A protein has these predicted regions:
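Structural recognition of the beta-strand scaffold that forms the well-ordered cores
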Residues: 116-119, 143-147, 168-171, 209-213, ...
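Active-site beta-loop-alpha junctions enriched in small/polar residues
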Residues: 123, 148-150, 174, 214-216, ...
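Active-site beta->alpha N-cap acidic-glycine motif
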Residues: 81-183, 191-200, 207-208, 303
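Catalytic grooves of carbohydrate-active enzymes
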Residues: 262-299
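N-terminal pre-catalytic segment of deacetylase/amide-hydrolase enzymes
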Residues: 9, 13-17, 21-119, 125-132, ...
Length: 306
């Protein structure tokens, strides 16, 4: 019996040892599994967190895309340009008169009336503004002069003469920057307000709130900023390359463009720095008058278009 008992004990011990070994091997195998120790509850939590993070990421991306596209459309920069067809007929612009009107902006007047609206951009004074003013006075024509800071600083007496002779002075910004690159209202306001302040110091009166974008560069947000500041924006429907001091057009070249492309309701842009303009303006006004045109002011244009 004892012998049997010993053998039985040995057998049981051997079986138990084998069983323990198998359990250990099983534990080792289980511990090596990649998902070892992760319960169903933990899996559920991770899955929920993943879905939440994915949803938030998708929402953020969609919002960023939407804002990006909106900003791109809103901040799109333009250079004002014109397309001419038949001589004597109004051109087409980058934007239509109706599209510009919602920003209190204009590029042409009433195309059924033989009226010209004469404007000058004044970047600096080089001796040509005086003969221009003399010609305007001779023909009793009132024009609008868009001035920058430099012109106000260096030629205050010329500005006073403009006002005394019934002309309008508008805002061409202080530093003649590419305003389409400005997205801040504070920066936009400073460029226009510095002109306002200096003009009032010189003349004792507020500047007329007419704005012309420097270089013809603009964006829709710029036009809205100008409107929010109480300005009316004026582009043009007739101009020619008259601003290069070392490459001035001849009298014949100037007349070809300015007589051939004149049209009813034209807002004409000339530069007061042009030697050619200073020399030909008297004769040019005479020729336009002989063609049956009269001259109006921008405030008349704006009031008719309102």
């Amino acid at each position: 019996a004892a012998c049997i008992s010993v053998r039985a004990g040995q057998t049981v011990g051997r079986r138990r040892g084998k069983a323990d070994g198998k359990e250990k091997e099983k534990d080792i195998r289980e511990s090596r599994k990649p998902w070892s120790g992760i319960t169903a509850q933990k899996v559920s939590i991770v899955a929920v967190l993943f879905l939440v993070m994915y949803a938030l990421g998708a929402l953020t991306a969609k919002k960023a895309e939407s804002v990006g596209v909106s900003a791109l459309l809103h901040e799109k920069s333009e250079n004002w340009g014109l397309g001419f067809g038949t001589e004597g007929k109004p051109p087409t612009g980058n934007a239509s008169a109706e599209e510009l009107k919602k920003y209190n902006a204009y590029f042409i007047g009433d195309t059924t009336q033989n009226t010209i609206y004469l404007t000058f951009d004044c970047g600096y004074e080089n001796g040509n503004t005086e003969p221009i003013l003399d010609a305007l006075k001779k023909h009793d024509v009132k024009a609008t002069f868009f001035v920058v800071g430099n012109f106000l600083e260096t030629s205050p007496e010329m500005v006073k003469r403009m006002i005394a002779e019934g002309h309008t002075v508008g805002n061409h910004t202080y530093h003649h920057l590419d305003m389409s690159s400005i997205s801040s209202m504070d920066a936009f306001k400073k460029e226009t307000q510095d002109v306002e302040n200096l003009f009032e110091q010189i003349t004792g009166t507020p500047i007329t709130k007419f704005y012309r974008p420097p270089q013809g560069k603009y964006s829709e947000s710029n036009l809205q900023m100008a409107k929010d500041l109480g300005y009316q924006t004026f582009f043009w429907s007739l101009a020619y390359v008259d601003w290069y001091q070392d490459k001035q057009p001849s009298k014949e070249e100037a007349f070809k463009k300015l007589l051939g492309r004149i049209h009813p309701g034209a807002i004409v842009l000339l530069h007061s720095t042009s030697d050619t303009n200073g020399a030909i303006l008297d004769e040019l006004l005479t020729k336009w008058e002989e063609m049956g045109y009269s001259f109006g002011s921008l405030d008349q244009l704006a009031s008719k278009s309102a």
